[in-house]
């Protein structure tokens, strides 16, 4: 076994263990009184465990994408069900932090083709970031705009720093000395989006400030 295979196997094993840990902590949060001294600490532990777990999922997916090994599998997805499953993933953190989570959907029920696991991972990660940096509001919207599915995550925090807005994340970034960010999440999102194609259109991502809530906005377009 070469070192790369060993590292990938180890990351996969750690990811599975973290998934079990987060499930236990989610159950603990539901049973703990909100005013209990351990409630905020359990919430923070859950957030950090989920953040690391998401990073490992992204690393494994990127390894497979770079090696042309990722089993890209676009399927027809009912957006209303997809939205409810994403909300279920983030709800324990939202409730623990007292965040107002808003959801905006097309009035017409719609289905869309995309790789469920890839898109679920990047949207969930974006919501986690919004919950971390918002003041008290986060909005998830899924609307068809210009014949593309537009998934937006908006918050009312301070927004993205100028340096991050100036970077397009075409390649993995080093650690930012000011923010501590590696840019992994945005790089993963961009690569995952670009796998989705329909005729001449390709999936894309961008970040901006302002948006619908005045803070940071993450926007994903899927053709």
Predicted feature descriptions by range:
Residues 75-76, 100-110:
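Conserved catalytic submotifs in the C-terminal HATPase_c
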Residues 137-147:
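Short beta-strand/loop element within the Bergerat-fold HATPase_c
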Residues 47-55:
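Short alpha-helical segment of the dimerization/phosphotransfer core of two-component systems
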Residues 155:
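Acidic ATP/Mg2+-coordinating residue in the GHKL
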């Amino acid at each position: 076994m070469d070192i790369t295979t060993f590292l990938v196997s180890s990351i996969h094993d750690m990811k599975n263990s973290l998934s079990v840990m987060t499930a236990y902590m989610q159950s603990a949060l539901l049973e703990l009184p909100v005013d209990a001294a351990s409630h905020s600490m359990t919430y923070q532990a859950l957030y950090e465990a989920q953040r690391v777990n998401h990073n490992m999922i992204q690393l494994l997916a990127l390894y497979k994408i770079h090696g042309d090994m990722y089993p890209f599998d676009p399927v027809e997805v009912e957006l209303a069900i997809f939205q409810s499953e994403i909300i279920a993933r983030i709800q324990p953190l939202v409730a623990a932090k007292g965040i107002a989570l808003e959801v905006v959907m097309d009035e017409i029920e719609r289905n869309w083709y995309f790789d469920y696991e890839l898109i679920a991972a990047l949207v969930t990660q974006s919501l986690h970031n919004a919950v971390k940096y918002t003041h008290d509001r986060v909005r998830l919207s899924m609307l068809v705009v210009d014949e593309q599915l537009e998934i937006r995550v908006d918050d009312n925090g301070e927004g993205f720093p100028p340096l991050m807005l100036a970077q397009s994340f075409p390649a993995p970034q080093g650690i930012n000395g000011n923010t501590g960010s590696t840019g992994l999440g945005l790089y993963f999102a961009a690569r995952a989006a670009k796998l989705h194609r329909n005729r001449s259109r390709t999936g894309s991502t961008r970040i901006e400030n302002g948006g619908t809530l005045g803070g940071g906005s993450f926007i994903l377009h899927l053709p």
